[in-house]
From Swiss-Prot:
Protein name, per record: Large ribosomal subunit protein bL12c
A single Gene Ontology CC term: chloroplast
Compartments in which it is found: Plastid, Chloroplast
Primary localisation category: plastid
A molecular function GO annotation: structural constituent of ribosome
GO aspect biological process, one term: translation
Tagged with keyword Ribosomal protein: yes
Gene encoding the protein: rpl12
This protein's UniProt keywords: Chloroplast, Plastid, Ribonucleoprotein, Ribosomal protein
Family of this protein: Belongs to the bacterial ribosomal protein bL12 family.
Function: Forms part of the ribosomal stalk which helps the ribosome interact with GTP-bound translation factors. Is thus essential for accurate translation.
Top-level lineage group: Eukaryota
UniProt subunit comment: Homodimer. Part of the ribosomal stalk of the 50S ribosomal subunit. Forms a multimeric L10(L12)X complex, where L10 forms an elongated spine to which 2 to 4 L12 dimers bind in a sequential fashion. Binds GTP-bound translation factors.
Pfam families per UniProt: Ribosomal_L12 (PF00542), Ribosomal_L12_N (PF16320)
Length: 128
């Protein structure tokens, strides 16, 4: 390439997106061309290339009790009752049949708070 071409390329590399858009519109006006026509071919090439999968952020979480040590059962039952509104027998049955979902379809902050309360009581907990 000639030195003039290299200089132009280097100047184009240093331009901001706003400056580049302004340059394109000035070239269109000056030379009477339409820069959008070649973009259609580029779109078809881009469409043929495999796209990266879109990763969605999880918005609903489930708090699971995985294990409750025997020495901590009473404390965990109290926390489960407070969180779920279950009776004593239902809460006891729930922690005896671990792994078990305590709360489902809740927000991230609430799930983290519940996890912290259950872990402080002695349970092994995961948030899914």
């Amino acid at each position: 390439m000639s030195t003039i071409t290299n200089q132009i390329i280097e100047q184009l590399k240093s331009m901001t997106l706003l400056e580049a858009a302004e340059l394109v519109s000035q070239i269109e006006e000056t030379f009477g061309v339409d820069a959008s026509a070649p973009a259609a071919g580029a779109v078809m090439v881009a469409a043929a290339a495999p796209s990266a999968p879109v990763v969605e952020e999880q918005t609903e979480f489930t708090v699971m009790i995985n294990d409750v040590p025997s020495a901590k059962r009473i404390a965990v039952i109290k926390v489960v009752r407070a969180l779920t509104g279950l009776g004593l027998k239902e809460a006891k049955d729930m922690i005896e049949s671990v792994p078990k979902a305590i709360k489902e379809g809740i927000g991230k902050d609430e799930a983290q708070q519940i996890k912290q309360q259950l872990e402080e009581a002695g349970a092994t907990v995961t948030v899914k």
